[in-house]
Amino acid sequence: MVLSQRQRDELNRAIADYLRSNGYEEAYSVFKKEAELDVNEELDKKYAGLLEKKWTSVIRLQKKVMELESKLNEAKEEFTSGGPLGQKRDPKEWIPRPPEKYALSGHRSPVTRVIFHPVFSVMVSASEDATIKVWDYETGDFERTLKGHTDSVQDISFDHSGKLLASCSADMTIKLWDFQGFECIRTMHGHDHNVSSVAIMPNGDHIVSASRDKTIKMWEVQTGYCVKTFTGHREWVRMVRPNQDGTLIASCSNDQTVRVWVVATKECKAELREHEHVVECISWAPESSYSSISEATGSETKKSGKPGPFLLSGSRDKTIKMWDVSTGMCLMTLVGHDNWVRGVLFHSGGKFILSCADDKTLRVWDYKNKRCMKTLNAHEHFVTSLDFHKTAPYVVTGSVDQTVKVWECR
């Protein structure tokens, strides 16, 4: 370490003072001569005892540094375990923690949808660049690109086995891909406008799609034929999602409503209207969350003795709503996002809700207490989509900033 001339001068005077005041006369006079010190009584008072003071303060600082280092290690330990020491969190309570594990670049336009594969450690992203990309979420490696659509890919969905992938696009088609050979095996035509959403039904035999042409269509996987059309929405249908057993489908629209349809009869079982703007996204509650929801909302158990089903919706009115589909009641409204809500889903543990929005954040909600318990500044631009892995501790988000991010939960 190099001392400046002034620091060197001060140190020399402090050493001289130490030698003199401790009776090392001979050493003092030699040192004074060699260091070329001009002794000045007034000036030297300033350096009286300075060397000892510096010495003790260094020891004090060292002790303080060691204390802070051990506190930092403790905090790091707590951060990784997600709770105070010794209190390991239950995986049901794991939530995404910053910073992201990976930020994946490759798309050349906004990312529209991100989903995890149900079996393998891969995830898939769709983009306005007309491609679908496959990534390994554990290593962050890019695996391949699926090309075939000629316009923005709006939504993607796996069947339960992960062998088939469905995609839909602004090119007005739905494509079915063999996810083992990565080839397009079928293209379905029938919508008259942008196809904004697609989902493979739980039984794997049918696909549902929603479009800007205001309809929802059901297609046979085997033949690619359209077997049903659900009409009722008055404007662009933004998203369609089947419930766990495939007996109901929910849809949301620019007409500010959420509708629930009975698949067998095509009848509209419920029309949920409380949002004050376009409803962008919907998500069914898993059965693992039913008891927590009933507890949180005090919703009475029906005569059948079984609560639910429950549905979440996110809107451009910046709110998230939870609905009891059997009664058509809005059970709660979560307020906190500062812009359009673009994605919403239940945490697989059933106690929390995750959402993403055009305010560039990913949020975790403790719906029992109706509060936002964590906000992650997730992207540089609007966050368009999120997915939560069913079994592994990962969340993935996609954004208009063209990146896909993987978040670890703990």
Curated annotation (Swiss-Prot):
Residue numbers spanned by region Interaction with dynein and dynactin: 83-410
Primary localization class, coarse: cytoplasm
Chain residue ranges for the region called Interaction with DCX: 367-409
SUPFAM superfamilies registered for this protein in UniProt: Lissencephaly-1 protein (Lis-1, PAF-AH alpha) N-terminal domain, WD40 repeat-like
Taxonomic superkingdom: Eukaryota
GO molecular function: dynactin binding; dynein complex binding; dynein intermediate chain binding; heparin binding; identical protein binding; microtubule binding; microtubule plus-end binding; phospholipase binding
GO biological process per UniProt: acrosome assembly; actin cytoskeleton organization; adult locomotory behavior; ameboidal-type cell migration; auditory receptor cell development; brain morphogenesis; cerebral cortex development; cerebral cortex neuron differentiation
Location of the region described as Required for self-association and interaction with PAFAH1B2 and PAFAH1B3 in the Swiss-Prot/TrEMBL record: 1-38
Expression by tissue: Fairly ubiquitous expression in both the frontal and occipital areas of the brain.
GO cellular component: 1-alkyl-2-acetylglycerophosphocholine esterase complex; astral microtubule; axon cytoplasm; cell cortex; cell leading edge; central region of growth cone; centrosome; cytoplasmic microtubule
Classification via InterPro entries: Dynein_regulator_LIS1, G-protein_beta_WD-40_rep, LIS1_N, LisH, PAC1-like_LisH-like_dom, WD40/YVTN_repeat-like_dom_sf, WD40_repeat_CS, WD40_repeat_dom_sf
Comment block on domains: Dimerization mediated by the LisH domain may be required to activate dynein.
Other information: Originally the subunits of the type I platelet-activating factor (PAF) acetylhydrolase was named alpha (PAFAH1B1), beta (PAFAH1B2) and gamma (PAFAH1B3). Now these subunits have been renamed beta (PAFAH1B1), alpha2 (PAFAH1B2) and alpha1 (PAFAH1B3) respectively.
Known disease link: Lissencephaly 1: A classical lissencephaly. It is characterized by agyria or pachygyria and disorganization of the clear neuronal lamination of normal six-layered cortex. The cortex is abnormally thick and poorly organized with 4 primitive layers. Associated with enlarged and dysmorphic ventricles and often hypoplasia of the corpus callosum. Subcortical band heterotopia: SBH is a mild brain malformation of the lissencephaly spectrum. It is characterized by bilateral and symmetric plates or bands of gray matter found in the central white matter between the cortex and cerebral ventricles, cerebral convolutions usually appearing normal.
Protein name: Platelet-activating factor acetylhydrolase IB subunit beta
